Structure formats: structure tokens, C-alpha cells
């Protein structure tokens, strides 16, 4: 698969950042993660960036033996997803203009 990158100044990325900050009660940091999914193709087809709400930590060993996830972080991720709907609705005009 090709690399996929979402610009941090895109309105959808800013909305995700605000949603995560609201759920976790503090500012969040951007990270880059590797993967082998179809994200680049999906972003190209939709003509929009993809935004992931990551709620795992390195010690969770995702897709490795003894994989785990902290329930408290998983629930905060669900809370962030709920905030994200409001944030995206608030910037709907900006999202349309960014396409």
C-alpha cells in the first residue's frame, strides 16, 4: 500500500484534536503510525483526509502476542468519538470548502 498522510491543518484533523482534548481533558499530540491497510486508497477515493482516534499505548502490543487495551482508554476513545460528531458538524462548511 502507499503512504497516507493527513495534513494537520485540515479542519477534520483540527476537529479530531478538539474532540480528543475534550475527552481526555488535556491537549493531545499528533503521532505517525505505520500500518498496512487501505487508508491511502480510501482517502483518494473520498477526496478527504483520514483521521484516527488512537487510544492505545505502546505497552498494549497491538497485533502482537499478549495484545491488550486499557479499558479506561477505550472508553475515553468512545467519548472522543461522540465529541467528534459535534466538532465535525461545527465545521461542516469548512470541510466542504477543503474538498
Show where each model-derived region lies.
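An extended, acidic, His-containing surface patch that forms the Zn2+-binding/catalytic region
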Residues: 1-99
Amino acid at each position: 500500500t502507499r503512504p497516507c498522510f493527513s495534513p494537520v491543518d485540515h479542519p477534520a484533523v483540527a476537529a479530531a484534536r478538539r474532540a480528543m482534548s475534550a475527552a481526555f481533558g488535556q491537549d493531545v499530540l499528533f503521532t505517525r503510525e505505520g500500518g498496512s491497510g487501505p487508508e491511502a486508497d480510501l482517502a483518494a477515493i473520498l477526496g478527504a483526509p483520514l483521521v484516527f482516534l488512537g487510544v492505545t499505548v505502546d505497552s498494549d502490543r497491538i497485533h502482537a502476542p499478549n495484545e491488550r487495551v486499557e479499558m479506561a482508554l477505550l472508553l475515553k476513545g468512545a467519548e472522543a468519538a461522540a465529541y467528534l460528531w459535534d466538532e465535525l458538524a461545527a465545521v461542516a462548511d469548512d470541510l466542504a470548502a477543503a474538498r
